[in-house]
Design a protein with these regions (language model features):
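Active-site and adjacent substrate-binding regions of carbohydrate-active enzymes
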Residues: 1-249
Length: 249
C-alpha cells in the first residue's frame, strides 16, 4: 500500500510501470479524491470535484485506490492547479479560501479545524480536525440547532456515499461512523501537544459508541445509514473498480 501524498500526476508512479516491469504497489491512498471532496463541501460546488475525478492519473488494471474521507493525517489541498483553473477558480486564492473555511477564519463557517504546518511566508498550510467537526456537527451540537445537526449528518453520509461508490477499497476512519468530534486531550501530553493532528487521533469513546443502538441519537443516525450503504456496496457489482471516469450529471 502506498501512502503517498503527492501531486495527482505523481501517484501513478507508485503503482509501477506495468504488471511485470517495475511492479510496485497494488493499492494507493486516493488523497486527491479526498481533497476534492473537502473542496466540494466548502464551496457547495462540485465543479472542481468533477474536473479532478476526470483527470485522476491512469493506473494499472492490477492496481486500485484506497478511497477515504478522513484518516490519521492532516488534509492537504493537493489538487492540480490546472484543474482549479478549469473549474473557474484561481489556485492561490482558492486554496486560501478552503483553508480559511475549515479553520474558522471564514465568516459563517461551522467548521472547527486548525491549520497544520502553516508557512507564515506563503500562507500555505494543511488542515487538522475530525470529520464531524469539520462538517459542522460540533458547532451544531453546541448551539442545539436541529437543522444544522441534520445538515452535518447528511454531509457525513454524502461524503461516505462517494467513497463507497467509487472504484477501489473504501476506508472508514475510526470514530467517523459515530460522528466523533475533535478532542483536546492531546494538549495535556507534552510529547504531542505541539502537533494538532492529535485532535483527530483521540482514544475511541466506547460509551459514545453504545449510543449507536439508541434510536434517534446522532450516533445511531450516522451508523445505521452507513451500515445500510456498506451492505448495498457489497451486493452491487457495478461499484467495483472498472476505472470508469464517466460522470453522470
Amino acid at each position: 500500500i502506498a501512502e503517498a501524498i503527492v501531486a495527482p500526476g505523481e501517484i501513478s508512479k507508485y503503482f509501477g510501470e506495468d504488471a511485470i516491469n517495475a511492479k510496485e504497489c497494488e493499492i494507493a491512498y486516493n488523497a486527491t479524491l479526498m481533497a476534492l471532496l473537502w473542496d466540494a463541501v466548502a464551496t457547495k460546488n462540485a465543479a472542481l470535484l468533477n474536473q479532478g475525478i476526470k483527470n485522476l492519473p491512469a493506473k494499472l488494471e492490477r492496481a486500485t485506490w484506497l478511497n477515504y474521507v478522513r484518516c490519521h493525517d492532516d488534509i492537504g489541498l493537493g489538487f492540480d492547479d490546472s484543474d482549479i483553473r478549469l473549474a473557474g477558480y484561481e489556485p492561490a486564492p482558492h486554496r486560501r479560501f478552503i483553508l480559511d473555511y475549515y479553520t474558522g477564519r471564514f465568516p459563517g463557517s461551522p467548521a472547527r479545524g486548525l491549520p497544520f504546518g502553516e508557512n507564515p511566508k506563503t500562507g500555505d498550510a494543511r488542515i487538522s480536525g475530525s470529520l464531524a467537526s469539520l462538517v459542522g456537527l460540533e458547532c451544531a451540537l453546541e448551539s442545539g440547532d436541529a437543522v444544522a445537526i441534520d445538515a452535518a449528518i447528511k454531509t457525513i453520509v454524502l461524503l461516505h456515499s462517494v467513497i463507497l461508490s467509487f472504484g477501489g477499497i473504501p476506508l472508514l476512519y475510526y470514530g467517523d461512523a459515530i460522528g466523533t468530534l475533535n478532542s483536546l486531550e492531546y494538549l495535556a501530553d507534552p510529547s504531542v501537544a505541539a502537533d494538532n493532528r492529535w485532535m483527530h487521533r483521540s482514544y475511541f469513546d466506547w460509551n459514545r459508541a453504545k449510543r449507536r443502538h439508541e434510536s434517534g441519537t446522532v450516533e445511531q443516525r450516522i451508523f445505521s445509514t452507513l451500515k445500510k450503504m456498506i451492505a448495498l456496496r457489497k451486493e452491487t457489482t457495478a461499484f467495483a473498480d472498472f476505472d470508469n471516469r464517466q460522470l453522470l450529471t
